[in-house]
């Protein structure tokens, strides 16, 4: 275990970094990425606020879509990169763990000029990245309700898995053409992880640590 952005993270699991890397490319990998910061944004001026604090065009984002974006600082430099997700009328922003407090303070400093509310959801909502060629077929097999996201990258949907309502997004940082990030109530994340691992381990799915992810 190593410290990363104030979180204890597994550098690797029992298979080691190389096998975790190759396993993700060939079959699929399970990554606990709950250390990433998650902020919920809502309120009448949410779009105007997001247009003000982010570099990408948040207004162009349709429901159940996501986009990569940057958080500029007050001088036009870079504070952090982030991912913005839209479900229905709500938005949530995923930021880097090491910048979470700094990003939160920066966003709050601008929120007072808008009719908008920010909620810190990092501890309430956990994240699993499920990345690699076999991931979609495994998810489809386990699906208990809802439907998978549209096939284009950056699409979202709501699914039921392991008795839990989950937001599934076709996003991820591994470079794999097929992969998902799953947003899960924290009290249910262990159940979902175990369900995915049990279903995928016979097909080569591995738990993957920070070393292989980097």
Predicted regions located by residue number:
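Glycine/proline-enriched, intrinsically flexible loops and inter-domain linkers
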Residues: 1-214
